């Protein structure tokens, strides 16, 4: 790939103009089906049915083998579309499959995940699901997961969470209560935000993705506020705002301590809590840690692929301390990045920007630019070949709020030779 096939930030007008350099439209790193399957274990009484080709079913089973501690505990079934289904439709047989799942599992609800082929042949999966739900007298939701229209597994997680709104029902609002819409593996009761909410007597109705039941999801509209800590929860938050008038706050993994402090102040206002001076002190501590980072990164150039923090905010903070981004890959577009894009445009950096299509771009750009360090994942062979400092954040326990920022900054200090 020639560097001219990528676009500089200065030539991009709006966030949504960021495009993929691949000739394949929106070719993502992982199928959105991957993202859907990652979330299947979190709802105890809702099995999943994948509707697609044999390959989709095989792909799903292989993912479960990799990510599950106990693969047999994943309630995932597959319906493989055959030639007759393409010609005559699969509605009747799909209904039989759902009946069998109901008989076997006695579930509270079922989720149907449809992949590319049903969409391409015009199969009305939503209609089949609606009719099956009526006949079986069982809540059945539908989540499309077609890779030709979605960029990555992140989109799959987002779409599945949004589909959960189909299970919800109007509830009496509970004052001083929240739902936590977070990233996978972040619903820990010991997370920074959770600890603070509990200490202040705030009731947490649902943490998702987190262990819960269909009943928990159904009653989620009883919360007075949704706290969105990860982009995958944003579609669901918007649906709940539209359907149940539940407000939401974005509390992303910011790199700027002032933004994290602002999030806490916003929560205090919405929940009518007294301001906690502890967060002011934490912001000062993390700002001091950034000052130390500045000595490690000043005058250095880097390529940014991904990190646990919000990408644009991370780049803006590194720029403040003298580091220059040569290229920046967007993994999956989201409102956390979108809200910071105007500030990004008016900054003093002008990296190449692209929607990430494949990791081969990294190798070619490393050969061209020879940066001082790389933020994201690289193969071990490429790291040895280029002798580049690679900040992949493997093994770093990432929480939320200031805890997440501290973990990332301490990792950077160690990786680039500083002292924490």
Task: Name each region found by the language model.
Residues 1-420:
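An N-terminal assembly and electron-transfer interface module characteristic of large anaerobic redox
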